Amino acid sequence: MIDFASFYQVIAKSRLSHWLHTLPAQLNAWENSERHGNLPKWQRVLTKLEHYQSSHVNLSDRVEIGQPGEISAGETRKLENLLQHFHPWRKGPFYLFGIHIDTEWRSDWKWDRVLPHISPLKDRYVLDVGCGSGYHLWRMRGEGAELAVGIDPAALFLCQFTAVKQLGGNDPQVHFLPLGIQELPPLRAFDTVFSMGVLYHRRSPIDHIYQLKDQLRDGGELVLETLIVDGDENTVLVPDDRYAQMNNVWFLPSPAAMIKWLKKCGFQDVRMVDEDVTTTDEQRKTEWMQNDSLAQYLMPDDPTRTIEGYPAPKRAVFVATRGSED
């Protein structure tokens, strides 16, 4: 079941305790909102999933809960059918009692690109902004994060996360809140803040950077991954309408422009640590995500261009430090 009370208990005696002045009212308002049309149906599925739980949890090199053969073949089929109610599964993959949830995105590939370049997460408070299904929260926990908090306003992602959490025994140090970054007060409490695949969806990228900064403690680390284009520090692509069929893409900076933005916002030790072209092996249709995917968003005769004629998706990871002077 969806439970926020356990998070309140966790943070009550932590450096996040001041969040309790505003958070319960926000989440009560979310729960009482009528905008989540499928939420009652998904909650009924979550109730049925309470029957399944395993003490086998591997978060070190994958997200694996339960093992093949731990439950009967019939129960495995029932579990798989229940999990299919949360289609489309976009971020993963997950391995649940031998069921391979082959998600649209190979989010493990992104994690493998990011992890070598960031500060160790052991004993850190971590915030993942726009966390989707919560896949990376589990990988962060697997790296020893003391507290991993994800925020994303999508009810479906919350239910996907809750399903995985329930199956693994409800880890008290991993939590998902259905909020956007703009709804958070300036907590200035997290050791590491991740924003991966969010910046280009924001109408004001500079405001987004400042919102991320407001969540970091002095000396904390920002890990930002976004779509980029080639060019100098003054190059920014603003799509006329859609980009790769997405109608909510606003600004795609060059790496040099992104570094300039981060420095302009007061970040220190700013660097690009990875650059990678997104391929149809990393983002594609699967049994668990049967809608259109990257292959349908590129020109059929030229995969280096989107269907609109823009450069095909290329992503970069930037790491920066919040200074202590502001």
UniProtKB/Swiss-Prot annotation:
Source organism of this protein record: Tolumonas auensis (strain DSM 9187 / NBRC 110442 / TA 4)
Entry annotated with the keyword Transferase: yes
Signal peptide range in chain numbering: none
GO biological process: tRNA wobble uridine modification
Subunit structure: Homotetramer.
Function noted in UniProt: Catalyzes carboxymethyl transfer from carboxy-S-adenosyl-L-methionine (Cx-SAM) to 5-hydroxyuridine (ho5U) to form 5-carboxymethoxyuridine (cmo5U) at position 34 in tRNAs.
Keywords (A to Z) from UniProt: Transferase, tRNA processing
UniProt-annotated binding residues for carboxy-S-adenosyl-L-methionine: K91, W105, K110, G130, M196, Y200, R315
Top-level taxon of origin: Bacteria
MF term (GO), any: transferase activity, transferring alkyl or aryl (other than methyl) groups
EC identifiers of the protein: 2.5.1.-
Full protein name: tRNA U34 carboxymethyltransferase
InterPro entries: CmoB, Mo5U34_MeTrfas-like, SAM-dependent_MTases_sf
Family according to the record: Belongs to the class I-like SAM-binding methyltransferase superfamily. CmoB family.
Catalysed reaction equations from the record: carboxy-S-adenosyl-L-methionine + 5-hydroxyuridine(34) in tRNA = 5-carboxymethoxyuridine(34) in tRNA + S-adenosyl-L-homocysteine + H(+)
NCBIfam families assigned to the protein according to its UniProt record, in alphabetical order: PRK15068.1, tRNA 5-methoxyuridine(34)/uridine 5-oxyacetic acid(34) synthase CmoB
Matching Pfam families: Methyltransf_9
